């Protein structure tokens, strides 16, 4: 917020409570210029040293999920995704401590659950996709109450830069719709879901309305449908009702090449050049295709009258040992930077080594996990060339 010096009455604005309109403008103001950061998807609660290390890369924000942490109940902060009954206070204290640590390191935080009532994260659900939230309205009601409680509890915390309602929602998944099918199919599917339990736009508007009753200031980040696919965002008929919303997509396409499964092939797919089914036809991926995929989100935002600084590449990445990972990361960043959006790489010092770009190519996965199990995490080499590439982009 600009310093006010001209008249005595203006100074009173600075004393307005956090949830005032004046402070709301200030909070969204963080996102008025491009911000670059990283994801924290750790099983152990990150401490100050972790956040300081992330800040040391040049990151200004962290997308922090808490759902993998050990909580009072089965599901951290939810208690139980089968029946939400309120925020467990031990979990609240643990999350607040992590937020304090991030704040002391100078990072802004976007908090994001992997699970919501009726939508337990598949990796904590025996590998099964939990579709209840998208088929039973009772769970949507619970999700609304959950976020109302979170907003009431954390609205005054200085570290929080946005509430990210849920990671990678996929109300489309069980309906037979192809994830990267024809754009006309995505649009038609969205039209068919209007006012139903799978209407993600309706769901988000409901949740945000509940948040605003408790917290008028904090921005909200929303992942697009079908695992935060920019094409699913482009199928939305309208922007959301609230003005302090950031629209997020994730970028791993072509997934067949960037994901762990590719590393198990005798000859891993290469980029550029890998061919996948996309938009109803075969596509040989090159930089222009990466750009076109990402541009779907920015073009939609422009059509909706939104600034490019309201669009976020909330995750992107590739397997660190894939020989084309550096080329891919650079192409993704170039595409987002060209449009002026925000980004956060996946991920920083996760317990999984697959996308830990600090690790050098010479460090084999087995060696990494052995060192972690032996309590030698401090001795793990962290001079990977991919992180040097990211640092250049973070500080550029």
Please annotate each region the language model reported.
Residues 1-9:
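Bacterial N-terminal signal peptides that target proteins for export
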Residues 8-17:
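Bacterial N-terminal signal peptides
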Residues 23-85, 300-301:
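N-terminal carbohydrate-binding accessory modules
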Residues 39-49, 69-72, 86-89, 170-172, ...:
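Acidic-and-aromatic substrate-binding clefts and catalytic sites of carbohydrate-active enzymes
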Residues 43, 50-59, 82-113, 124-165, ...:
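An active-site-proximal structural segment forming one wall of the substrate-binding cleft
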Residues 70-90, 119-137, 173-189, 356-364:
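Surface-exposed, active-site-proximal loop segments in enzymatic domains
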Residues 123, 131-283, 295-319, 338-344:
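Active-site region of glycoside hydrolase catalytic domains
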Residues 323-396:
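Aromatic-rich peripheral "rim/lid" segments of glycoside hydrolase catalytic domains that contact
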